């Protein structure tokens, strides 16, 4: 298991639950054009290894060690990962540990539109925070009226729902009210990483005790920075860069 110890040394993460999977399963390939205008990105996902997450992997995790659990909707797109994630969400919900999901819809692997909707709605019932864009809420509702689905679910268990609308900004729903936030005007070179960047800025801000408004602004700023840089995780700003960007550009919101 030297490979997993190496991961732990590099990324400073617990690796006890890591395991090798059959070599027939693959990591994903991303192909991105380097031209600035009208660029296209392609994610090739054939037998991806991350969808091999199973219930045995979940059983190795002591969820009591964590302040919250974050779920990517991509993990719901195929088995055995889908069932493993549903099991994990129910376990953490029973433990009263905050659950967060990025709906993170990808069109591949899903069997049908009906299954997409059924699975998304099942797991959304367990969540404390739901984050998704207009397309993803449409998919979850199997309709073109995803905004209404967000309004329905804020009356259920979730305490916060973020409904992202691309260049039009985002709506943030709570039990008490609905707020809308704009975006920062930047020259993007690619969309890759914007969602992860928003999530990182938004959730880390809430974790550090900031207001929902500040969290939404920091999430949007984080995303705006990342789309102007090459790469994804390597493009993420540090806190100093984020604060500087917000101070220089907040008047746009």
Show which residues each predicted segment covers:
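Short beta-strand scaffold segments in enzyme catalytic cores
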Residues: 29-33, 169-172
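A generic structural signal for short hydrophobic patches within well-formed alpha-helices
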Residues: 58, 76, 106, 137-138, ...
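A glycine-rich helix N-cap at a beta->alpha junction
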Residues: 12-24
């Amino acid at each position: 298991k030297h490979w997993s110890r190496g991961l732990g040394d590099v990324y400073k993460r617990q690796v006890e639950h890591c395991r090798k999977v059959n070599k027939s399963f693959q990591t994903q390939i991303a192909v991105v054009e380097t031209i600035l205008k009208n660029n296209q990105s392609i994610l090739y996902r054939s037998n991806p290894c991350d969808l091999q997450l199973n219930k045995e992997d979940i059983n190795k995790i002591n969820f009591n060690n964590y302040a919250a659990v974050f779920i990517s909707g991509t993990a719901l797109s195929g088995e055995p990962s889908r069932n493993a994630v549903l099991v994990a969400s129910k376990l953490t919900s029973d433990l009263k540990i905050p659950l967060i999901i990025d709906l993170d819809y990808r069109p591949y692997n899903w069997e049908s539109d009906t299954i997409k909707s059924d699975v998304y709605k099942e797991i959304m019932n367990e969540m404390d925070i739901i984050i998704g864009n207009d397309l993803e809420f449409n998919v979850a509702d199997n309709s073109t009226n995803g905004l209404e689905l967000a309004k329905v679910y804020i009356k259920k268990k979730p305490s916060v729902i973020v409904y992202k609308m691309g260049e039009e900004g985002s709506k943030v729903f709570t039990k008490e009210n609905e707020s809308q936030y704009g975006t920062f005007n930047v020259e993007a070179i690619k969309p890759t990483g914007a969602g992860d960047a928003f999530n990182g800025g938004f959730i880390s801000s809430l974790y550090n005790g900031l207001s929902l408004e500040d969290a939404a602004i920091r999430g949007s700023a984080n995303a705006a920075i990342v789309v102007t840089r090459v790469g994804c995780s390597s493009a993420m700003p540090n806190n100093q860069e984020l604060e500087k960007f917000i101070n220089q550009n907040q008047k746009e919101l």
